Amino acid sequence: MAKEEAITVDGTVLEPLPNAMFRVELENGHKVLAHISGKMRMHYIRILPGDKVTVELSPYDLSKGRITYRKK
């Protein structure tokens, strides 16, 4: 059985939360809870409030996501 494709959207980090979690506001105005992807954690990429990021959302739960890219 094939896995569903993740939905990729852009957003802005609102606030950092404990355990490398972040509150992110998406372009459409929704707020989601997102964690850092493994590669970003491995390369010590820091994310601060106000950063523009790319978030992958699961089609099953649109309130949680994974931050995959921090834009310059």
Swiss-Prot record:
Keywords: Cytoplasm, Initiation factor, Protein biosynthesis, RNA-binding, rRNA-binding. Its main location: cytoplasm. GO terms for molecular function: ribosome binding; rRNA binding; translation initiation factor activity. InterPro entries: NA-bd_OB-fold, RNA-binding_domain_S1_IF1, S1_domain, TIF_IF1. It is found in: Cytoplasm. One of its GO terms (cellular component) is cytosol. Residues 2-72 form the S1-like domain. Pfam families: eIF-1a. Belongs to the IF-1 family. One of the essential components for the initiation of protein synthesis. Stabilizes the binding of IF-2 and IF-3 on the 30S subunit to which N-formylmethionyl-tRNA(fMet) subsequently binds. Helps modulate mRNA selection, yielding the 30S pre-initiation complex (PIC). Upon addition of the 50S ribosomal subunit IF-1, IF-2 and IF-3 are released leaving the mature 70S translation initiation complex. Component of the 30S ribosomal translation pre-initiation complex which assembles on the 30S ribosome in the order IF-2 and IF-3, IF-1 and N-formylmethionyl-tRNA(fMet); mRNA recruitment can occur at any time during PIC assembly. This is Translation initiation factor IF-1. It comes from Leptospira interrogans serogroup Icterohaemorrhagiae serovar Lai (strain 56601). The lineage of its organism: Bacteria, Pseudomonadati, Spirochaetota, Spirochaetia, Leptospirales.
